[in-house]
A protein has these predicted regions:
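Flexible nucleotide-interacting loop at or near the entrance of a catalytic core
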Residues: 80-132, 136
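A short, aliphatic-rich beta-strand micro-motif
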Residues: 36-44
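Conserved post-Walker A coupling segment in P-loop NTPases
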Residues: 108, 122-188, 198-214, 279-284, ...
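Regulatory loop-to-helix N-cap segments in sensory/regulatory domains
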Residues: 56-74
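Signal-transmission/dimerization alpha-helices at domain junctions
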Residues: 8-12, 46, 71-89
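Nucleotide-binding/hydrolysis machinery
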Residues: 156-159, 234-244, 251-349
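Regulatory sensory and allosteric helical modules in signal-transduction proteins
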Residues: 1-27
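Sensor-regulatory modules in signal-transduction proteins
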Residues: 43-46, 230, 280
Length: 349
């Protein structure tokens, strides 16, 4: 009766004098307990009731009071936060396992050029360590792919790999994404949210376009890199995480340091190991391997059978300078696969 009411209204209930209450005294569960007063409050998450907290007093001289109701509501709120965090973590575990399967298929660093051989050797040496890695290179060269390869070849490979583009968010939103926020921390923060660093605990976090991060967020990131705990936005609880950081940039961080746009101490913290990914125009011998890899994968995805590239189409790919690097090559081949009509990719595609 009371439980149904709380589930329906989402409001807590304090009931006194149960033995003399006509609606309650014959309830078998209350009779078995010998309850004289009770409290029932919901454990809420957004607009759903996840469960109930019951508190009973069997002593008629020590009836539960309003203060007891407030205390039980506070306990239910804490339980709600714990359950919400557990659900978020469970969701992340499932998502990370799905992504991990995709990563195994996508993390092969395609190429036999001297530059790619050197990259693979660097990854093999650095992956087994806990060192922070700074991946540098032009946009589209595959910096995230390098970060994924480092993670999947490291002792943390069973942990999560969390990726975040630092240039895609405003400073306040980036801080919330990185470190999380408490309910009510700002307009629109209707629920507590764990940040990327918490989500990446025992794993790796990849911070792309780190050079675009604003000074205020840089300072907080530096403290985390130094092993210090952090707090969620709007919170006071200290949170400690064990996370490996791999950062990437396509800007000149040294100039940014000189200009005061990037903290010098953070630069040195990030610049423990540097991996520079060459542009596609500097490893053109890898273009046939990359082109055929993308063709096989993308044609399978759309359900088309394509034999390969015509000689003239491949010569055209080799002559082009690829300012957008591997990303541009992949996009071009995807467009040809989707729009093409023959069993071979030609120069007109």
């Amino acid at each position: 009766f009371i439980s149904d009411s709380v589930m329906r209204t989402h409001e807590g209930v304090l009931a006194h004098d149960i033995s003399s209450n006509r609606a309650l005294k014959n309830r078998q569960s209350l009779e078995e307990i010998g309850a004289e007063s009770l409290i029932c409050v919901p454990i809420r998450s957004e607009d759903r009731v996840l469960g109930l907290v019951h508190l009973y007093s069997t002593d008629p001289t020590k009836a539960l009071q309003r203060d007891d109701l407030e205390f039980t509501l506070a306990v239910a709120h804490q339980l709600s936060q714990v359950v919400t965090e557990m659900k978020q973590r469970e969701s992340l575990i499932v998502e990370n396992e799905r992504l991990r399967e995709n990563l195994r298929a996508e993390t092969s660093l395609i190429g036999q050029s001297l530059g790619m051989d050197q990259i693979k050797q660097q990854i093999a040496r650095v992956a087994s360590t806990h060192a922070t890695v700074l991946v540098r290179g032009e946009s589209g060269v595959g910096k995230e792919l390098v970060a994924r390869a480092i993670h999947l070849n490291s002792p943390r490979k069973l942990g999560p790999l969390i990726c975040l583009n630092c240039a895609a968010l405003t400073e306040s939103l980036l801080e919330s994404e990185l470190f999380g926020h408490e309910k009510g921390a700002f307009t629109g923060a209707t629920e507590q949210k764990i940040g990327k660093f918490e989500a990446a605990h025992d794993g790796t976090i990849f911070l792309d376009e780190i050079g675009e991060m604003k000074p205020g967020t840089q300072a907080k990131l530096l403290r985390v890199l130094e092993g210090q705990p952090f707090e969620r936005v709007g919170g006071g609880k200290s949170i400690q995480v064990d996370v490996r950081v791999v950062a990437a940039t396509n800007v000149d961080l040294e100039n940014a340091v000189q200009d005061g746009r990037f903290r010098r101490d953070l630069y040195y913290r990030l610049h423990v190991v540097e991996i520079k990914v060459p542009s596609l125009r500097d490893r053109k011998e890898d273009i046939p391997l990359l082109a055929n890899y993308f063709l096989e994968r993308l044609s399978h995805e759309v359900g088309r059978r394509i034999r390969g590239f015509s000689d003239e189409a491949m010569r055209k790919l080799m002559r082009y300078d690829w300012p957008g690097n591997v990303r541009e090559l992949k996009n071009l081949i995807e467009r040809a696969v989707v729009l093409g009509t023959s069993e071979e990719i030609t120069e007109t595609d």
